[in-house]
Amino acid sequence: MVLLYSQASWDKRSKADALVLPFWMKNSKAQEAAVVDEDYKLVYQNALSNFSGKKGETAFLFGNDHTKEQKIVLLGLGKSEEVSGTTVLEAYAQATTVLRKAKCKTVNILLPTISQLRFSVEEFLTNLAAGVLSLNYNYPTYHKVDTSLPFLEKVTVMGIVSKVGDKIFRKEESLFEGVYLTRDLVNTNADEVTPEKLAAVAKDLAGEFASLDVKILDRKAILKEKMGLLAAVAKGAAVEPRFIVLDYQGKPKSKDRTVLIGKGVTFDSGGLDLKPGKAMITMKEDMAGAATVLGIFSALASLELPINVTGIIPATENAIGSAAYKMGDVYVGMTGLSVEIGSTDAEGRLILADAISYALKYCNPTRIIDFATLTGAMVVSLGESVAGFFANNDVLARDLAEASSETGEALWRMPLVEKYDQALHSDIADMKNIGSNRAGSITAALFLQRFLEDNPVAWAHLDIAGTAYHEKEELPYPKYATGFGVRCLIHYMEKFLSK
């Protein structure tokens, strides 16, 4: 996929379907953010009476016989002194939506004068590219006649030398191949994206990139490893579970290793603690954590980062049936810790627990980061724009927060309240899998933390229940699967671990 190109000269630009022109907002009025020919000013000067240049505002105009592009989009970037990376990201995502609805395929984008901004040309271009790439996406549909919007096919960014721009654009395109993989997996029918399908995708990645190795455990191997919690959740499903291990060796001589774990519940009915229909209808997205890990590995291998990373995906359906695991029963995890089942709809933490135990036994991790659409309580707490995360290590938490801020993928650190751990008490087992009806996200994280046992490994848990899937478009993401987390984690690993 090569979509974005850079061109230093305005005069030498190629003909295109559309031109995007940037504007600041000053005193509630639009102010030109770049110098253009008088022919273009004649096109847009009358439109400025109804266009203020505020963040993300657009105006769609038609050119004339003297303009090289016949469609012109005015794009507001807000006050120049307040522009941030997120402003740029969301503005160019909005412009991409407008351009695609106008059925444009080739686009010229004129950069604003960046020297007066608080951040670098590189940061501006990175966020511009991310905005365009994020909304140049179609989720899978099943119409008899395809009604999807056409893609942008060539976007030329003017005002930057190719040596600088093209390097940034190639990197972002590689990164978004991972984002698109994550989105496609989450958006596709649950009957298609089974545990076996996730395993097949992991195998395909290992076949594509020599730096990746893959190991797949079937039900028999899962039982042999004594992963009783994953096996319990899988009991009621007609589809077979899989335990997927991906390994990336980007720095073989280093002992530093990051383990990424993704919850892979390919459909969650709630089990015998059956979800109501309205809550179940989107549950094909309950494997978004697994899809995020696969997307990260796609980008990681493509970018050839000099780090060592292991990805672990416990994958199963949580189905209702006569063989399904039961509330009130006790099941034993990989290390011998026993769990009384208070709800079969709290299954994600069970399979993550066995994955954490596996990582500690076999991977010698420096840090563990897990991704899971784990609790509705997190959606109540932070909504759909911010993912909550928990961490037992302040350095890891600080670095994740910084990567979040710099990519626009919002994370907010939540507290591991030690007092709440007592809510997991069981009279007949080492713990229950649910607490009381309060602080549900915190008690879920505390449950996972118990499976670290006495290991001092740095650990973070990202609850992406609200951010992984949106039922309406919310910039800079399209409708449905967002691919949230891929960009943030790649940036985190590149900035803080690739040394």
UniProtKB/Swiss-Prot annotation:
Superkingdom classification of source: Bacteria
Disulfide bonds: none
One GO term (biological process): proteolysis
Catalysed reaction, written as an equation: Release of an N-terminal amino acid, Xaa-|-Yaa-, in which Xaa is preferably Leu, but may be other amino acids including Pro although not Arg or Lys, and Yaa may be Pro. Amino acid amides and methyl esters are also readily hydrolyzed, but rates on arylamides are exceedingly low; Release of an N-terminal amino acid, preferentially leucine, but not glutamic or aspartic acids
A GO term from the CC aspect: cytoplasm
Matches recorded under NCBIfam families: PRK00913.1-4, PRK00913.2-5, PRK00913.3-5
Protein's job: Presumably involved in the processing and regular turnover of intracellular proteins. Catalyzes the removal of unsubstituted N-terminal amino acids from various peptides.
Name the record gives this protein: Probable cytosol aminopeptidase
Organism, scientific name: Chlamydia trachomatis serovar D (strain ATCC VR-885 / DSM 19411 / UW-3/Cx)
